[in-house]
Amino acid sequence: MGSRDHLFKVLVVGDAAVGKTSLVQRYSQDSFSKHYKSTVGVDFALKVLQWSDYEIVRLQLWDIAGQERFTSMTRLYYRDASACVIMFDVTNATTFSNSQRWKQDLDSKLTLPNGEPVPCLLLANKCDLSPWAVSRDQIDRFSKENGFTGWTETSVKENKNINEAMRVLIEKMMRNSTEDIMSLSTQGDYINLQTKSSSWSCC
């Protein structure tokens, strides 16, 4: 059997300085720097994965500048995306509350071919820092109320939960690409990455 290629466009959005560029660099190149310059407009990276013996996944990662939510360009950037990651800084409550605006902007401009919202993970980044400005209960409630696929804490600096979270997103996109699109009865739940990379805490 010949190999099958899957190409997915994944948006990485959120306020400035929450770690979007760091996430893209960590995931695509396994590198981290404290000295990234602020993204202007949009930046791109490619991640290629041997998903199975006969399937290759190519992720086109779109790192969208935090200021772009206030421009009309987001509709162009969002076009044809298969999934999204919305990030916030757990030590900054404003970036958390603004995640709702990013999600609303996304949902108003982008849907799957069947009209459903695209899969979207909420990443609580910089979890290695303290104190947190929001509680886990707040994040959990927020994720469910705003229609996220799920959420988890991440530390790009310490490379915590990055590959695991992205795997959950890829699995969701792969299911969608085979037209097995079913709404989860429970959405927005915390993604338990410790027990199994693709498990949901509600299961």
Curated annotation (Swiss-Prot):
Impact of altering S72E?
A: Loss of phosphorylation by LRRK2. Does not stimulate LRRK2 kinase activity
* Marked site positions, Cleavage: G41, V42
User: For the modification Phosphothreonine, which residues carry it?
Assistant: T71
Topology in the lipid bilayer is annotated as: Lipid-anchor
Q: Result of mutating W62A?
A: Abolishes interaction with LRRK2 and reduces membrane localization of LRRK2. Impairs RAB29-stimulated LRRK2 kinase activity on RAB10, RAB29 and LRRK2
Q: Which Pfam families match?
A: Ras
Quote the protein name from its UniProt record. Ras-related protein Rab-7L1
Question: In which organism is this protein found?
Answer: Homo sapiens (Human)
